[in-house]
């Protein structure tokens, strides 16, 4: 997947799942499955339920994504 093709969207983490997977709720009400990007994993960035995150979605599968950023607040 080329980075230009990715769809970036904001969301809220609803629940934590095993293997660094998260259920993220998007503003339109959809819930997707997302995993942490490699850089966030390397820098030990913790994500908890309730955190606002930026998720990259592939145009081919809109039910799975990659968390690329956790908001400061």
Curated annotation (Swiss-Prot):
One of its GO terms (molecular function) is ribosome binding. The keyword RNA-binding applies. InterPro entries: NA-bd_OB-fold, RNA-binding_domain_S1_IF1, S1_domain, TIF_IF1. GO terms for cellular component: cytosol. PANTHER family: TRANSLATION INITIATION FACTOR IF-1, CHLOROPLASTIC (PTHR33370:SF1). NCBIfam families: infA. This is Translation initiation factor IF-1. It comes from Syntrophobacter fumaroxidans (strain DSM 10017 / MPOB). The gene is infA.
